Amino acid sequence: LFRSQVQVDGEIFEAPIVINAAGVYADEIHNMICEEKIRIVPRRGEYRLMDKNCGDLVNSTIFQQPSKMGKGILVTPTVHGNLLVGPTAEDIPDKQDVDTTAEGLAKVLNLGSNSVDALDGRQTITSFAGLRAHLVHEDPAEKSDFLIEEAAGHPGFIDVAGIESPGLTSAPAIGEYVAQIVENIYPAERKADFVDTRKGIPSMALATEEEREALIRENPAFANVICRCELVTEGEILSAIHRL
């Protein structure tokens, strides 16, 4: 059986399967292994999160005309009752640049107002940016798509690269597809006791006073409020991280 090997700080790690799901860095890992090179450009998207008093401006996601850069600025209600507006789409050179910009956030508001003219920038409670892993083809006519396959000539090396919109929606199906690729290469027994559901995360905003007191007694981190607007505590954030 083919085994990949990497040496880090004098230690050698081996694995029969390597899944390259490194986001904007997936091209760098792929190009260490494969003769046929790929290139990924980070495409930054900026969002505004509006206050809950804007949440009833729409009752479904409103998209605009898509372009070659993506689906454009959308306006969507969140499950928590806020309004989310964005994202922009800007190709940038820095794979770690997740800063928001005055120009980008102004664009979010201006273009979002084409869909919902009642948007008020003063109701923005926070803003953030993320990077899409945009796979660039040498032939401009070739349509960009997810790269999900075992690399030719390198058994056991599986690329899961260029996962941009609608990558989040596709994630469960991508996971099952990659699992099938792995199973075809390296037969493994399925865990009989695998737990396929995640325990819910406590919510201080929705809890009763008695429930809040109990959570704080159990873990004082629930008394440390990180976001006053939404009443999100350190305990909830840590609970979410540990449930990944």
Question: Which residues fall in each region the model found?
Answer:
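Small/polar loops that bind or transfer phosphate-bearing groups
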Residues: 21, 228-229
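C-terminal catalytic lobe of FAD-dependent flavoproteins
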Residues: 66-72, 79-80, 91-225, 232-236, ...
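Flavin-dependent oxidoreductases
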Residues: 4-86, 90-101, 110, 119, ...
